[in-house]
Amino acid sequence: MRTPFITAGALTALLFLADSAPGQAPARLPPVNGLDEFMAVPEDNPLRVDVILLGRRLFFDPRLSRDGTRSCASCHNPVRAFSDSVPLSSGVGGRRGRRNAPAIINRGYGTSFFWDGRAASLEQQVLGPLQNRSELGAALPDVLARLGADSSYRAQFAGALGVAPTASALARAIASYVRSIRSGDSRADRYFAGDS
């Protein structure tokens, strides 16, 4: 039953950030018991509400998959604590993956990604599932062409990141959204904040 609280926490953080006017200094997520210092946020991708909202839109958009049937949220379902409930996740065409989808709550605090640790940042990680044939199975040029053909996406990319849809901009936006998905008040959060 913690899922509604986690989702509410993520939405509260987004609403807090929405108070920032365009052109202002990057807004920060509300501190989570003093844990901000542990979040790895690249200098070239500070947490900003407009980028997070673009990332959220992309995260839930099935057009990122090869056949338009799956999105990041298909396996990282907010109703299931941003995970899924099966031992092996399935991707486009019902293909079974080799592992289940890990929960992505608090992944902004991570320092390595994928089961083998091959990605050192969320920006590096997010493009992997998009192109993996057992997950979203898309060709990156095709995804970028679909996004570029959508005038609302072109406007949102330009407004948030100052560019047309590119692989780097796509990765930065989704990574920002994933960083905004935080639990906020677990026992571990309180421990790291010094409340033992």
Question: Which residue stretches match the model-derived regions?
Answer:
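Bacterial N-terminal signal peptides
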Residues: 7-18
